[in-house]
């Protein structure tokens, strides 16, 4: 294991691929967004794709897509075939930053992780990276009509490791997982915590994530459940095999399309309780929270009338309440 980790340490930094990602974008537009990450004390970027077919009245499947080490949301969402397939099939796609280019999404612990450390990074980088994914998921679930039985998680390299980790930690959320060339160095016991079917994809000539390590993970994975799939690409590398391979993306979306979160019971829609909201000038309104994108919040009075206000216009207590509501919404199955 020490040899494989050494290889990973030397080669895992994912080369920026912006110039190589020739546009295969669907008619919908990739949006560059930010939201205020309170615990981090700054705004964090994420990328979002909304298909032209999206309608609020029809819940849409959602793919959460995690980038690799040294990359960012705007690169991974432009992997060839991603938005094309999303448009064809009606998927929302969101790519969180995971705080920065090297957060590891919590897969290497709450601190800075083994690889990619940079002076100035917060001591709790892994914790912030994990929370950023959940924050963005909460924002999208609040703003859009998302099919809760069809929320998927996929990632490349560092993002593949994050997919395995978050897939286990929040196993009730995901209908399927797709780790691609996963940079995962933790215990394989994590497989026992994963409930969703997995499709692991790797190239047999990958020099960043040793294929022997992925094969061992895949072997343990298939022993744990017959629903998991392992795809090894002959001659496949760590880069173009994934970001310049629309045929692979078609296979991945085919896999996602076949998976739905099971065991959900029909229940009456939950309605948030009424509470008193105050703005900074002291004016009060009794209402319930409806949605928030992290910058604005929509609230509804008892009579059904809705209001959308800037989050910053509310009292500190109400801002904290909305932030907590967003975080809790992200982890609801």
Where are these regions (language model features)?
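A domain-start/cap signature at the N-terminus of enzymes
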Residues: 21-62, 74, 129, 265-268
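Short substrate-entry loop that stabilizes the transition state in hydrolases
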Residues: 54-106, 207-208
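Primarily recognizes the serine-hydrolase "nucleophile elbow" in alpha/beta-hydrolase
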Residues: 78, 138-145, 149-194
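Alpha/beta-hydrolase active-site loop
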Residues: 120-144
């Amino acid at each position: 294991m020490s040899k494989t980790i050494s290889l990973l340490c030397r080669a895992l930094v994912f080369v920026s691929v912006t110039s190589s990602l020739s546009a295969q974008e669907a008619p919908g537009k990739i949006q560059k967004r930010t939201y205020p990450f309170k615990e981090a004390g700054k705004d964090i970027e994420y990328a979002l794709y909304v298909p032209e077919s999206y309608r609020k009245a029809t819940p849409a499947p959602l793919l959460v897509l995690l980038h690799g080490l040294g990359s960012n949301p705007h690169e991974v969402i432009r992997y060839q075939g991603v938005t094309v397939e999303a448009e064809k099939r009606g998927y929302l796609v969101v790519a969180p930053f995971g705080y920065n280019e090297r957060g590891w999404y919590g897969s290497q612990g709450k601190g800075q992780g083994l690889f990619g450390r940079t002076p100035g990074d917060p001591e709790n980088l892994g914790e912030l990276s994990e929370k950023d994914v959940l924050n963005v998921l909460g924002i999208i679930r609040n703003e859009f009509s998302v099919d809760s039985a069809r929320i998927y998680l996929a990632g490349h390299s560092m993002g593949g490791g994050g997919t395995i980790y978050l897939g286990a930690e929040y196993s009730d959320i995901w209908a399927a997982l797709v780790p691609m060339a996963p940079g995962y160095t933790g215990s394989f016991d994590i497989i026992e915590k994963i409930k969703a079917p997995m499709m692991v994809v790797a190239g047999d000539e990958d020099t960043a994530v040793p294929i022997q390590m992925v094969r061992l993970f895949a072997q343990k994975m298939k022993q744990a459940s017959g629903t998991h799939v392992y795809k090894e690409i002959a001659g496949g590398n760590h880069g173009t095999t994934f970001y310049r391979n629309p045929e692979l993306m078609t296979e991945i979306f085919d896999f996602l399309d076949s998976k739905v979160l099971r065991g959900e019971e029909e229940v009456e829609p939950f309605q948030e309780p009424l509470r008193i909201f105050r703005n900074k000038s002291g004016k009060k309104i009794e209402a319930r929270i409806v949605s928030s994108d992290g910058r604005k919040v929509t609230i509804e009075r008892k009579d059904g009338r809705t209001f959308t206000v800037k989050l910053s216009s509310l009292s500190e207590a109400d801002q904290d309440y909305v932030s907590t509501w967003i975080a809790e919404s992200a982890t609801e199955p």
